[in-house]
């Protein structure tokens, strides 16, 4: 009986399996995803000055692209790869010429459009480089400007780096101007696009650009035919005139002595008002010409109960109509080189990239990965120097300050009052001897002149982080000078430079590594 039951179960199982084998499952395959039709222009607006020029417009689309009617006063030339060259001749009239280019993408019965506004001013653009060549030009809102884009920096020396010998001082092979980024201090995304108005134009060795209705900072570059950056310029848009005045340092007998003519604010700031977000300048790695943005977080009015809290250091990553997002990974090391001109060519090519030190080395520099201590030509390089170089980030007529503008410096011991130029708040009496006033309003005042110096923090990666962030905004201030470290021995000393460091507890002249990004208060050449 048991055997018959088992046999019956086996037969049933076989029958079921056979039935399953003969049954065809009716499963519908999911339809292949098809992306919506799109078309996007590299620029939404191009602005020419009265002399005209040409600009390149690139279209990205998953359809077949064609151009529409060309507005009167402009020409359009089609290139390979959905690229067009728009040209404007000399505007001989008294009025601004404007129009609109319409590009259409077609796929089957679908269509999509991208529109590009074209504007040509009737007035001649102001030549910013007429007052001197530089890596930074100051402009006002709602103006049209141009500058010489055939020379690197001020064209006058490379700090002994051999860069000019290897790469020259003239810019060759430039075909197009591009906006790398534009930004406001507050990071307002809607107004960030209003710093630069339209795309910059390269013509006959000059870059022409127009400013919008918003103050801020921007970076404009010249590229070759392959889109590689050949050089770039910081555009500082402020309606508050930048001025200079006496910087006073008492001599050993306490007598006031004018040692420089100093700028009225930090490089890239809109003002120098205590507790004002716009008193923050741009950040610079030592020796580099291209800036990084300060935090967008307002200063705390009630102090900082916790040190270096993330909410007090929000990063400003806006680029507006720029073409290159910020590249601030903490793993961004440059190629491994040990000879001059180091990684200057790499830094020129990637002005939006923060370059870190090589983790296997103790040099704390972006310049080289290793160095022969006996090779003075490498260890004594001064990319920023007492005499202005092509890498100096200050506007024409200004330069990065030299050393000893804020008292003599040396091997500073912050616990030794004799080495300090500013102390703790409770150490100040009516006859205090410090050169810096006590810490107030997120900054300190230089007593001999009354100049305010905001503590803007720094821009550097912290251990264990994947990105470079703003740190210690409103709590710590660091200002670069050109002076190298001369007192230490060992590799680290070769790439340390004087900075003015201040917080609530102290102020002093010390030394910092090249990879740090700090503030600059320019002085007259």
Model-derived segments and spans:
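Bacterial Sec-dependent N-terminal signal peptides
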Residues: 5-6, 16-42, 108, 112-115, ...
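Short, solvent-exposed loop/linker segments at the N-terminal edge
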Residues: 46-52
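Surface-exposed binding patches on compact interaction domains or structured appendages
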Residues: 54-85, 125-208
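Extracellular/luminal low-complexity segments enriched in Ser/Thr/Pro
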Residues: 83-98, 202-215
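A short beta-strand micro-motif common to beta-rich folds, especially ectodomain repeats
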Residues: 95-108, 215-225
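GGW-centered surface loops in extracellular recognition modules
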Residues: 127-128, 132-171, 227-282
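A short glycine-rich, aromatic-capped structural motif
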Residues: 246-372, 402-404
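C-terminal, surface-exposed recognition/capping segments
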Residues: 269, 355-356, 360-525
């Amino acid at each position: 009986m048991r055997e018959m039951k088992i046999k019956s179960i086996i037969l049933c199982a076989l029958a079921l399996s056979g039935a399953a084998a003969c049954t065809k499952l009716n499963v519908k395959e999911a339809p292949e995803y098809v992306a919506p039709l799109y078309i996007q222009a590299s620029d939404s607006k191009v602005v020419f000055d009265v002399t005209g020029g040409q600009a390149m417009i690139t279209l990205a689309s998953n359809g077949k692209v064609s151009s529409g009617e060309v507005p009167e006063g402009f020409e359009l030339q089609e290139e390979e790869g959905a690229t067009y060259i728009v040209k404007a001749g000399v505007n001989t009239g008294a009025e601004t010429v404007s129009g609109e280019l319409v590009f259409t993408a077609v796929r089957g019965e679908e269509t999509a459009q991208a529109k590009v506004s074209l504007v040509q001013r009737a007035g001649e653009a102001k030549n910013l480089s007429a007052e001197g060549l530089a890596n930074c030009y100051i402009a006002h809102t709602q103006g049209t400007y141009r500058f010489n884009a055939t020379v690197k920096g001020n064209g006058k020396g490379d700090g002994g780096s051999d860069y000019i010998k290897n790469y020259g001082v003239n810019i060759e092979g430039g075909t197009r101007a591009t906006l790398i980024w534009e930004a406001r201090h507050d990071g307002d995304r809607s107004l960030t696009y209003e710093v630069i108005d339209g795309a910059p134009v390269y013509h006959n060795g000059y870059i022409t650009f127009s400013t919008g209705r918003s103050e801020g900072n921007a970076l404009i570059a010249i590229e070759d035919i392959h889109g590689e950056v050949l050089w770039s310029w910081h555009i500082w848009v402020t309606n508050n005139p930048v001025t200079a005045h006496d910087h006073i340092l008492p001599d050993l007998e306490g007598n006031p002595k004018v040692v420089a003519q100093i700028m009225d604010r930090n490089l890239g700031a809109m003002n120098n008002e205590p507790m004002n977000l716009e008193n923050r300048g741009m950040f610079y790695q030592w020796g580099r010409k291209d800036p990084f943005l300060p935090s967008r977080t307002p200063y705390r009015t009630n102090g900082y109960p916790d040190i270096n809290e993330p909410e007090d250091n929000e990063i400003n990553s806006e680029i507006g109509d720029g073409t290159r997002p910020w590249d601030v990974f903490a793993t961004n090391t440059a190629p491994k080189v040990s000879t001059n001109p180091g990684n200057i060519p790499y830094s020129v090519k990637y002005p939006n990239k923060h370059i870190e030190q090589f983790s296997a080395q103790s040099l704390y520099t972006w310049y080289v990965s290793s160095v022969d201590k006996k090779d003075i030509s490498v260890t004594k390089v001064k990319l920023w120097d007492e005499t202005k170089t092509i890498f100096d980030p200050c506007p024409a007529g200004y330069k990065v300050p030299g050393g000893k503008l804020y008292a003599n410096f040396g091997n500073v011991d912050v616990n030794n009052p004799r080495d300090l130029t500013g102390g703790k708040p409770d150490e100040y009496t009516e006859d205090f001897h410090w050169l810096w006033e006590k810490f107030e309003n997120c900054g300190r005042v230089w007593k001999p002149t009354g100049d305010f110096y905001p503590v803007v923090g720094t821009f550097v990666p912290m251990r264990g982080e994947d990105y470079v962030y703003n740190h210690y905004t409103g709590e710590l201030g660091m200002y670069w000078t050109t002076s190298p470290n001369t007192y230490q021995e060992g590799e680290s000393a070769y790439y340390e430079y004087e900075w003015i460091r201040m917080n609530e507890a102290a102020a002093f002249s010390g030394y910092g590594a090249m990879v740090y990004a700090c503030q600059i208060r320019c002085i007259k050449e």
